[in-house]
Amino acid sequence: MAPSNLPPIFNATSQDMEMMLTAQCHLGSKNMQTHMEPYLWKTRPDGVNVINIGKTWEKIVLAARIIAAIDNPADICVISARPYGQRAVLKFAAHTGAVAIAGRFTPGSFTNYITRSFKEPRLIVVTDPRTDAQAIKEASYVNIPVIALCDADSPTEFVDVAIPTNNKGRHAIGLVWWMLAREVLRLRGTLASRETEWDIVVDLYFYRDPEAEETKEIEEAKAAEAEEAAPDTLNPADNWDAAGAVAPATFGGTPAAGNWEASGADWATAAPAGGESWAADAPAATEPKW
């Protein structure tokens, strides 16, 4: 990594660098655009261009200083047509006061004042110059500065500040937007000092698949129902006691042999109780007296 050209107070910490490496912000595409060559560190044997994350950090700080220089946060428009960046721009707008356009950009939003979505921002920040090309093109018509997250193969035409990073991975996109929001809040004074940790975790900026979330909720609900039904199936005796029936007797061990032979009697030869024989003669019939 090349030495930083920033003042010492803006230098990145080792934790910031580790986070960018973990989120794979340094992995660019195999194709390369000529204007992005100064931001590349080297090319791997498999053809993947590796981005210099030191340059990435410098551009994040530069972009944050430009954003913080605008008095009214509502004059900043953050845009992402790429699904992986839509959650990030919404969170960025919520934390910094900017206006978010997540999803399809309506043509004419910057040039046609008749449309309901017409806006006149002083600055726009886009996730990908390729997917957000319509917004960049209209911004060039009305002289709006553009900040963009650019990969190794991203077109840089009409882009004023390019932040070199991997703009195709959901973790890389979310992390760069999170770092940009944190630097803006630091420059505005919302965070007391650079040593103060931001209480917003970076996970909130990561893309989440709605279908995966619904599937997870359904599985959790089924697991909860199974846990509730488990005691009834495993302990049927509890239901019998609830109905007022007597629970079956249980034995702690094998009964002693002496208990069975205590009487010493033979069941085969024992006489019936009462001294009567089952083979006794029937009583004689008596004649009725009229």
From Swiss-Prot:
The keyword Cytoplasm applies. This is Small ribosomal subunit protein uS2. InterPro entries: Ribosomal_uS2, Ribosomal_uS2_C, Ribosomal_uS2_CS, Ribosomal_uS2_euk, Ribosomal_uS2_euk/arc, Ribosomal_uS2_flav_dom_sf. Pfam families: 40S_SA_C, Ribosomal_S2. Keywords: Cytoplasm, Ribonucleoprotein, Ribosomal protein. The gene is RPS0. Gene3D superfamilies: Glucose-6-phosphate isomerase like protein, domain 1. SUPFAM superfamilies: Ribosomal protein S2 (SSF52313). One of its GO terms (biological process) is translation. Component of the small ribosomal subunit. Mature ribosomes consist of a small (40S) and a large (60S) subunit. The 40S subunit contains about 33 different proteins and 1 molecule of RNA (18S). The 60S subunit contains about 49 different proteins and 3 molecules of RNA (25S, 5.8S and 5S). Interacts with RPS21. It is found in: Cytoplasm. It comes from Arthroderma otae (strain ATCC MYA-4605 / CBS 113480). The lineage of its organism: Eukaryota, Fungi, Dikarya, Ascomycota, Pezizomycotina. Residues 252-290 are annotated as: Disordered. Belongs to the universal ribosomal protein uS2 family.
